[in-house]
Amino acid sequence: MTTLHHDRDADGILTLTIDLPGQSMNVITPEFTADLAAAIDTIKTDAGIKGVVVTSGKASGFMAGADLKGMGALFGGGGSLKATFDQVWQLNALFRALETCGKPVAAAINGLALGGGLELALACHYRVCSDSPKIALGLPEILVGLFPGAGGTQRLPRLMGVQPALMYLTQGKSMSPQEALGFKVVHELASADQIVARAKAWVLANPKAVAPWDEKGFKFPGGAGALNPGFAQTFVGANALTAKATNHNMNAPIALLSAVYEGAQLPIDTALRVESKYFARVVADPQAGNMVRSLFVSKQAAEKGARRPAGIAPMPPKKIAMLGAGLMGAGVAMVAAQAGIDVVLLDRDMAAAEKGKAYTADRLAKKRTDPAKMEQVLGRIHPTADYADLAGCDLIIEP
């Protein structure tokens, strides 16, 4: 197995360490899913395995989700909708197989867990996360024209309640480990060097663990169901906010709401198939492929200088000028100053220029920026009404 390393200890706990060769971050690939499927078969059939801990061998994080570049064949509906469903259902079914393998499974989350990476962790019975404030956990698929398609729309609402889950799902927001603990998305926080040990301790103490939604009498936090007034009102509001943001011109948000609404009223196995049904419809439409290409694939290529002319050395600017201190000009000035660049902020008079700098000060204060850092950033912004102050600028921008 090239993407999963196996290590069984004396207590019979199998540690699966995800470590994709040649990748800076773990992502879900066909090789990974094949390795995970083989591992699940071993877990089910080997009586010597008493439980499982899933973790990452990457210092960069746990897992960042699906390899979007490798999903190109799915986009645009090249085959039948049934064929697309069968393909997208495979990952959902695989995570469900892990969840129902008959052994306790814990995730030791050592870093970033996004998209399918978080969905994998949610399919584990227990989640221990590193307490580092730099870690982000989330399902950001909606930001690139998709939505979570490996159980995220069903497990997250069952953990934290429908209304708070929709806030994260529809906006693609990430949460900190502390927020995740408060929402019961993770069960425990520990230092990075202790998460595997804590996960193993839980596995040993819970030999017959099952997911909450597989227990008799499970109920959604906050309630769910078509006859629950609060449940219905939640979707009325969510639909209105989606319409305001997209004019219902985007497929993914509507499909996401439908998957959550329908799935919340069904047993988990049926709900997961509903999710895959809507996910297949989204990826079969050309819109999803176009958005992934523009917002992810092409963006990454541009950031790496894919079209940069050969033989021209980089010229990082040391001093730039903004012609106009309005919201956009002041915003660009703030970002540049935070990057260590001096900014001449020019407007028709000093009052207007100073107002632009004051906007930056207000933004930094609202973000609770460290006072010393705030002073450094503001010190790089030079308001003026004199065009002579543009002398020596490497770049002049008119927003």
Residue locations for each model-derived region?
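Conserved CoA-thioester-binding segment of acyl-CoA-metabolizing enzymes
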Residues: 1-55, 93-96
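Hydrophobic, secondary-structure "cap" segments at the distal end of domains
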Residues: 152-163
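Amphipathic alpha-helical segments at domain termini/boundaries
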Residues: 1-19, 122, 163, 170-278, ...
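Glycine-rich beta-to-alpha active-site loop
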Residues: 92, 96-144, 148, 324-332
